[in-house]
Curated annotation (Swiss-Prot):
This is Ribosome maturation factor RimP. It comes from the Bacteria. It is found in: Cytoplasm. The keyword Ribonucleoprotein does not apply. Transmembrane segments: none annotated. Its main location: cytoplasm. Pfam families: DUF150_C (PF17384), RimP_N (PF02576). Required for maturation of 30S ribosomal subunits. GO terms for cellular component: cytosol. Keywords: Cytoplasm, Ribosome biogenesis.
Length: 178
């Protein structure tokens, strides 16, 4: 503060944006720390850090061929928990609960490799901006060449094909066909 009063930023930053940046930073740090230690047959699927009620939850989603067992999650927790304690400086502003689990049926597809492996699967795609007035597509992933997702989806009762540029994708996950 100077003699003229408080300094006012030209652009106002919403508290939600600051929190989102902090969470992204925590996720990046945790991902870089645990990735080298999660070895075959396991695959790191995702890292999430969320507030649920008054608690913070750090979720490490791991999978393997044939699925994850309770014993697997226990073994991985015993590897991951001490690793997180070694991060310096501590990125966590609050105490958190560590949850190591399977990604479940609607697992996120975070990488180009995971999308290539999902060709032929039923997926849910959220976009940054709408294509033909649609921002969320759910359908069969027909192809992914690294740049474009080709999806067969239902528009009311008609099958349609849409090509979605990979850079337009905000989020992709597996979906359950009902």
């Amino acid at each position: 503060m100077d003699s003229q009063g408080p300094i006012i930023l030209e652009k106002s930053i919403k508290i939600e944006e600051v929190i989102k940046i902090a969470i992204t930073s925590i996720i990046d740090i945790v991902t870089k720390t645990v990735t080298p230690e999660i070895k075959a047959p396991y695959e790191l699927v995702d890292v999430e850090y969320d507030k649920m009620g008054s608690d913070y939850i750090l979720s490490i989603l791991v999978d393997k061929e044939g699925g994850i067992t309770v014993e697997d999650t226990s073994d991985l927790t015993n590897i991951i928990s001490p690793l997180l304690d070694t991060i310096d400086p501590d990125p966590f502003p609050n105490q958190y609960m560590l949850e190591v689990s399977s990604p479940g049926l609607e697992r996120p597809l975070k990488t180009a490799d995971s999308l290539k492996a999902a060709v032929g699967s039923y997926i849910n795609v959220s976009l940054y901006q709408a294509i033909d007035k649609v921002k969320v597509f759910q359908g069969d992933l027909l192809a992914f060449d690294g740049e474009t997702l080709t999806i067969d989806y239902l528009d009311k009762t008609r099958h349609k094909i849409v090509n979605i540029p990979y850079q337009a994708v905000a989020k992709v996950r597996m979906a359950v066909k009902l």
